[in-house]
């Protein structure tokens, strides 16, 4: 528990300081957010606000992860070092952040709303997702456990649902496709949510808080752990405590970033941050074997994504009519006259309730047990 608190504290402090310095740098360089003319008129005042703040979050998370392990090793030379699961999650987070950075940089340098086109963005996301999935299904430990598995999971692996039903080769291929669906959905879900000051960062804080608790519990009830209640209900998740550490570090980093990102925002996370955060959330779901549960824990991102899908589908089916005043959903309420802060806080409440329901679903079997 001490390393988790230490990691969260280090990342919080580093982001608080680093973001302020980054804001000054971006202002000096003239790197500000471009605002679309067809968006809510209230957003025009945000034109020129520094963006790409996600770069600070990504860099801080990596640094805090290494520092926490270094300090833990200095205190106790027998303390475990960075895990394969930890490195894989950082790879996915940084890789998606790089895609977002390219998108942000094109927008800023050319002062337009379009960065990478949709096809290029999806291709880059898929390439990183494939690399992550292939690596995650390899690197077995001495117990034969790989960071990820071909089994489909809810709060744990679902009996009888294994993508390797027709052999290992097909199982790996199907897992790569399955993992990429989760990664693409999560990254774009967070990206769509990042439309109001503090909305995506605040909602993500609660999700990473949930994965911190999940990782701690999975570690305590890990197969082979002396604290496990029973070998029949233990978890076979690889490196759960290190995943909990990373979740706590990202939790702290986002709280620090939220200090500067809350309304009126001094900096935006940009696609650099939203894609990185979405990638990390997907990584936690895959590596902690809670893939379907993510639809509840990250339910706010699901609802906002669905609002876009419904808007586009309704528009095409009705020949130009709109279901919402504007999509994503948060902009619909803006155009209805809700204050930005009101929308953000109410969406946080909704997101928090969904996280609580997700945690309840995760722990439900233990209440019954």
From Swiss-Prot:
Signal peptide: none
Bilayer disposition of the protein: Multi-pass membrane protein
Entry keyword Cell membrane: yes
Transmembrane segments: 2-22, 55-75, 82-102, 120-140, 163-183, 196-216, 240-260, 267-287, 292-312, 349-369
Cofactor: Mg(2+)
Coiled-coil portions: none
Function (record text): Catalyzes the initial step of the lipid cycle reactions in the biosynthesis of the cell wall peptidoglycan: transfers peptidoglycan precursor phospho-MurNAc-pentapeptide from UDP-MurNAc-pentapeptide onto the lipid carrier undecaprenyl phosphate, yielding undecaprenyl-pyrophosphoryl-MurNAc-pentapeptide, known as lipid I.
Record-given protein name: Phospho-N-acetylmuramoyl-pentapeptide-transferase
Assigned keywords, A-Z: Cell cycle, Cell division, Cell membrane, Cell shape, Cell wall biogenesis/degradation, Magnesium, Membrane, Metal-binding, Peptidoglycan synthesis, Transferase, Transmembrane, Transmembrane helix
Matching InterPro entries: Glycosyl_transferase_4, PNAcMuramoyl-5peptid_Trfase, PNAcMuramoyl-5peptid_Trfase_CS
Gene Ontology terms: biological process: cell division; cell wall organization; peptidoglycan biosynthetic process; regulation of cell shape
Gene: mraY
């Amino acid at each position: 528990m001490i390393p988790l608190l230490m990691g969260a504290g280090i990342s919080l402090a580093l982001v608080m300081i680093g973001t302020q310095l980054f804001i000054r740098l971006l202002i000096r360089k003239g790197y500000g957010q471009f605002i679309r003319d067809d968006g809510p008129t209230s957003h025009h005042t945000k034109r020129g606000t520094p963006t790409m703040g996600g770069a600070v979050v990504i860099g801080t998370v990596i640094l805090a992860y290494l520092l926490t392990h270094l300090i833990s090793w200095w205190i106790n030379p027998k303390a475990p070092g960075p895990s394969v699961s930890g490195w894989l999650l950082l790879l996915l987070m940084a890789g998606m952040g790089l895609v977002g950075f390219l998108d942000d940089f094109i927008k800023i340098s050319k002062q337009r709303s379009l960065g990478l086109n949709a096809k290029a963005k999806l291709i880059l996301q898929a390439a990183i997702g494939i690399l992550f999935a292939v690596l995650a299904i390899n690197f077995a430990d001495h117990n034969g456990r790989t960071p990820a598995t071909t089994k489909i999971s809810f709060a744990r692996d679902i009996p009888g649902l294994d993508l390797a039903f027709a052999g290992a080769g097909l199982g790996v291929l199907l897992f790569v496709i399955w993992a990429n669906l989760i990664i693409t959905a999560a990254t774009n879900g967070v990206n769509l949510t990042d439309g109001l000051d503090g909305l995506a960062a605040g909602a993500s804080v609660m999700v990473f808080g949930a994965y911190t608790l999940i990782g701690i519990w999975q570690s305590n009830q890990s197969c082979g752990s002396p604290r496990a209640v029973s070998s029949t209900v233990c978890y076979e998740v690889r490196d759960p405590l290190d995943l909990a550490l990373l979740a706590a570090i990202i939790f702290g980093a986002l709280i620090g970033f939220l200090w500067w990102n809350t309304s009126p925002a001094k900096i935006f996370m940009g696609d650099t941050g939203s894609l990185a955060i979405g990638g990390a959330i997907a990584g936690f779901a895959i590596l902690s074997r809670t893939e379907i549960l993510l639809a509840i824990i990250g339910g706010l991102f699901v609802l906002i994504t669905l609002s876009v899908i419904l808007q586009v589908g309704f528009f095409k089916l009705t020949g130009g009519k709109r279901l919402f005043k504007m999509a994503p959903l948060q902009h619909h309420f803006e155009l209805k006259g809700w204050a930005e802060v009101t929308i953000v806080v109410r969406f946080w409440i909704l997101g928090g309730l969904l996280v609580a329901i997700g945690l309840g679903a995760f722990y439900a079997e233990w209440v019954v047990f």
